[in-house]
């Protein structure tokens, strides 16, 4: 009896272990999915790194643009450095602040849509016109925010249209293709014979006999 009880206990334990394994696997899968989804949302450190990188690239592009603009205005090689510095500052603020605000809003809201881009544009306008009057700052905020929002909406719409067109082309069956129309017109046999005799008469003209003088 004791042996039977011990064997039954072993069977129960093994069945419980086998039943708990799928649950543990399911929990591991859910934990993995949640961790992968959490990795999609950028962390504040990642936002700061993006801010630094975008600001540096914007400053470089702005300096090149400003220096070229100074040379175009014939300010000389030394005088163009002033324009290069101002343009580098403007482009660095544009790229850095916009990237930082978009990244932070994506982390807070958990979405990546045109609202984030519009708010980032507003913050960029405020940063550009910060040492100014409140009316000018508000106008710059509204201008940059509206422009960024509209541009992002147009980009999303174009990508959606491109995906829909490609999906339609892939799913379209060859049965819906229209058959090619034949433009050949049947010609009667009598017309063919008359046309062939006319062509022969053109290729082999008859020799006319003129009367000779005696």
From Swiss-Prot:
* Membrane topology label: Multi-pass membrane protein
Which keywords has UniProt assigned to this entry? Membrane, Mitochondrion, Mitochondrion inner membrane, Transmembrane, Transmembrane helix
Sequence segments annotated as region (Disordered): 1-35
Where do Basic and acidic residues bias regions lie? 18-35
Q: Where is the composition biased (Polar residues)?
A: 1-17
Where does this protein have coiled-coil stretches? none
Q: Which Pfam families match?
A: Tim17
TM ranges: 38-61, 88-105, 114-130, 137-154
Q: Name one GO cellular component term.
A: TIM22 mitochondrial import inner membrane insertion complex
List localization entries. Answer: Mitochondrion inner membrane
Q: Which Gene Ontology terms describe the biological processes this protein takes part in?
A: protein insertion into mitochondrial inner membrane; protein transport
Tissue expression: Expressed in young cotyledons, roots, flowers and leaves.
Q: What induces or represses this gene?
A: Up-regulated after antimycin A or rotenone treatments.
What is known about what this protein does?
A: Essential core component of the TIM22 complex, a complex that mediates the import and insertion of multi-pass transmembrane proteins into the mitochondrial inner membrane.
Protein family: Belongs to the Tim17/Tim22/Tim23 family.
Q: What protein am I looking at?
A: Mitochondrial import inner membrane translocase subunit TIM22-3
> Which species is the source of this protein?
Arabidopsis thaliana (Mouse-ear cress)
Lineage runs: Eukaryota, Viridiplantae, Streptophyta, Embryophyta, Tracheophyta
């Amino acid at each position: 009896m004791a042996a039977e009880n011990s064997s039954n206990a072993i069977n129960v334990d093994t069945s419980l272990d086998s039943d708990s394994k799928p649950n543990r696997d399911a929990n591991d899968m859910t934990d993995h999915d949640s961790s992968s989804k959490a990795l999609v949302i950028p962390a504040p450190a990642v936002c700061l790194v993006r801010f630094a990188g975008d600001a540096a690239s914007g400053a470089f592009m702005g300096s090149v643009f400003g220096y070229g603009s100074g040379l175009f205005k014939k300010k000389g090689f030394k005088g163009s450095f002033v324009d290069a510095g101002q343009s580098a500052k403007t482009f660095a603020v544009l790229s850095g602040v916009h990237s930082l605000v978009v990244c932070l809003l994506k982390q807070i809201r958990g979405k990546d849509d045109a609202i984030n881009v519009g708010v980032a544009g507003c913050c960029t306008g405020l940063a550009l016109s910060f040492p100014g009057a409140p009316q000018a700052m508000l106008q710059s905020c509204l201008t940059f925010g509206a422009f960024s929002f509209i541009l992002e909406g147009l980009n999303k719409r174009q990508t959606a249209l491109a995906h829909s067109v490609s999906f339609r082309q892939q799913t379209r069956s060859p049965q819906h293709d229209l058959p090619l129309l034949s433009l050949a017109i049947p010609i009667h046999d009598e017309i063919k014979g008359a046309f062939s005799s006319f062509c022969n008469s053109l290729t082999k003209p008859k020799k006319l006999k003129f009367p000779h003088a005696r």
